[in-house]
Design a protein with these regions (language model features):
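Short His-centered aromatic/hydrophobic patch
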Residues: 88-94
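Aromatic "clamp/platform" in nucleotide-sugar-dependent glycosyltransferases that forms part
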Residues: 264, 283
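Donor nucleotide-sugar binding/catalytic pocket of nucleotide-sugar-dependent glycosyltransferases
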Residues: 54-55, 134-186
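A short, well-ordered alpha-helix in the C-terminal region of glycosyltransferases
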Residues: 329, 336, 343-358, 364-370
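Conserved acidic donor-binding segment of nucleotide-sugar-dependent glycosyltransferases
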Residues: 315-316, 320-327, 336-342
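A conserved mid-protein helix/loop that constitutes part of the nucleotide-sugar donor-binding site
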Residues: 16-21, 199, 203-222, 328
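Short hydrophobic beta-strand element within catalytic cores of glycosyltransferases
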Residues: 291, 300-303, 313
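Short, structured helix-loop element that forms part of the nucleotide-activated donor/catalytic region
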Residues: 43-47, 231-258, 262, 343
Length: 376
């Protein structure tokens, strides 16, 4: 009989996008049950991955009453399912899932830490976030930071004294290099997006403050004033509730004719293929998939010196690393990429090979399998 594993995320889109294919792979060796908040994505995950799904409502934000309800629901579920392992991803699922698994004395309790919020928070919020992360670690038997930066922060801030395990070279699910490639179909679609005769900078993600969008808007305004033959392609949507951009930033982005909005896209490959440089001035990450994807598509990247980004990008090799929150450094890096075509093309030529050699999906999946087997 296969051992049972509960994989828990706060919202189903995390199962759908971050763990694509992984649940199906693990289900060949274990009985995998996917648990998350209700939603059409949860149903889609069940069909695509061939796993059973269970809906348990969880809130991403701090919500004491709902959090207690979610905890009790998870305890009931775990007592019913009697899993060998509970493996959580995302902060709230980690806190509630690890606590419920500890209450039920599940033998293996694994949590993966991705982007940490507390290092960039202040005051009471920071103390509360650190306390919840400490509780998550206290309940877990196996703690898996997504990368070296996350591992260092967990140690530096004294979140836990337990051993921390990075699987492979880091990342949640690795990258499918055969999918993120400049195929004929992708390049045909890219031709309809590309603007000839200019250098296109591309950003993919939520258009919010902590992705560095305020700095990017101001830097591009200055860049475009000096070098009209440039373009900014934004693939993502504004968010009005969680960390919206400044009103003047939104106005700047919407009114500039050299900025193109593509909105949210299920397939970002044509947009990356139609671009020359990927720019990602985020304040905090765990191990950003989008930087891996841009690199796999052969783009040099401008990233900030934060967790994950500074592991994926080697400065001057496959991109440039700049300080976060630094508009002038961002402008300087964008100017360099725009004016030095030789350096830009040289970095582009090394991007795909570097990403594939360290983060190819089949390699990471094999490391995940070995990790699970070592815990049996």
């Amino acid at each position: 009989m296969k051992k049972k594993v509960l994989r828990i995320t706060t919202v189903p889109v995390s199962l759908d996008l971050l763990l694509k294919g992984q649940l199906k792979m693990l289900n060949e060796m274990y009985e995998v049950v996917a648990v998350s908040s209700p939603g059409k994505e949860l149903e889609e995950v069940g069909k695509r991955e061939g796993v059973r799904t269970v809906a348990v409502r969880m809130e991403r934000r701090i919500s004491p009453i709902q959090d207690l309800k979610s905890l009790f629901a998870l305890v009931r579920l775990i007592r019913k399912e009697k899993p060998w392992m509970v493996h959580t991803l995302t902060p709230k699922a980690g806190l509630l899932g690890m606590l419920a698994a500890w209450i039920c004395r599940v033998p293996v309790r694994m949590h993966m830490f991705t982007g940490l919020v507390f290092p960039t928070s202040t005051g009471l919020k920071r103390k509360l976030l650190m306390a919840t992360d400490r509780l998550t670690c206290a309940c877990a038997t196996f703690i898996n930071p997504e990368g070296e930066g996350v591992k260092n922060d967990l140690m530096r801030f004294g979140i836990t004294r337990k051993e921390l395990h990075i699987v492979g070279n880091g990342n949640i699910n690795g990258i499918d290099m055969s999918y993120f490639d400049r195929t004929e179909e992708v390049m045909r679609k890219a031709e309809n997006i590309r603007e000839k005769g200019c250098v296109t900078f591309c950003f993919v993600g939520r258009i919010v403050g902590d992705k560095g969008m305020n700095e990017l808007a101001r830097a591009f305004k200055q860049l475009e004033a000096d070098f009209p033959a440039c373009r900014l392609l934004l693939v993502g949507d504004f968010e009005e509730k969680l960390d919206p951009v400044l009103p003047e930033t939104k106005r700047m982005l919407l009114e500039n004719s050299r900025i193109t909005f593509a909105g949210w896209q299920n397939d970002i490959r044509p947009y990356l293929a139609a671009s020359d440089v990927f720019v990602f001035p985020s304040y905090r990450e765990g191990f950003p998939n989008v930087v891996l994807q841009a690199g796999a598509m052969g783009l040099p990247c401008i990233v900030t010196d934060i967790n994950g980004c500074n592991e994926i990008i080697c400065h001057g090799v496959n991109g440039l690393i700049i300080p976060s929150h630094d508009e002038s450094a961002l402008l300087k890096a964008m100017k360099f990429m725009l004016t030095d075509e030789h350096a830009r093309m040289e970095m582009a030529g090394k991007s795909r090979e570097l990403i594939g050699s360290r983060y190819e999906r089949s390699f990471l999946w094999n490391e995940i399998r070995k990790t699970y087997q070592s815990l049996e």
